[in-house]
């Protein structure tokens, strides 16, 4: 008999498969729901090199490899500049790498997606919340 509290163990291969199918701004809600279905409770994506860390129950964690060259992240978060870069990307005016460069110049260290609350939070290097968005 399997315990109802048993942890769901997901792999980086499963996440990569979902990302290949649903990993775009247009399909973000479906992507996050699919991650939740795998057992991912939260993930952090780091602007400096594009790697992500995925967390599940019982301390389960998997890490993706870097996806681009290392970008220097500004020491101080600049909210208005950050929002300009983010909005340009949301309008499909920039590539992922161009957005990442803009976020790094704006002092954004990472974003965190919570699959339960369907939120995405952007943080600067000091750990300050720069923006919390509902994923819809």
Q: Which role fits each region the language model picked out?
A:
Residues 25-37, 46, 91-118:
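Short glycine-rich, low-complexity/disordered patches
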Residues 62-111:
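Short, solvent-exposed interaction modules
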């Amino acid at each position: 008999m399997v315990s109802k509290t048993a942890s769901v163990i997901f792999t980086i291969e499963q996440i990569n498969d979902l990302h290949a199918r649903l990993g775009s701004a247009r399909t973000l809600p479906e992507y996050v729901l699919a991650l939740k279905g795998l057992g991912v409770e939260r993930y952090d994506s780091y602007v400096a090199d594009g790697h992500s860390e995925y967390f599940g129950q019982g301390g389960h964690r998997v890490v993706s490899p870097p996806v681009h060259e290392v970008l220097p992240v500004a020491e101080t978060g600049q909210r208005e500049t950050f929002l300009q870069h983010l909005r340009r990307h949301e309008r499909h005016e920039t590539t992922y790498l161009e957005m990442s460069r803009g976020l790094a110049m704006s002092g954004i260290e990472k974003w965190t997606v919570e699959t339960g609350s369907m939120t995405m939070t952007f943080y600067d290097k000091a750990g300050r919340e720069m923006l919390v968005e509902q994923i819809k």
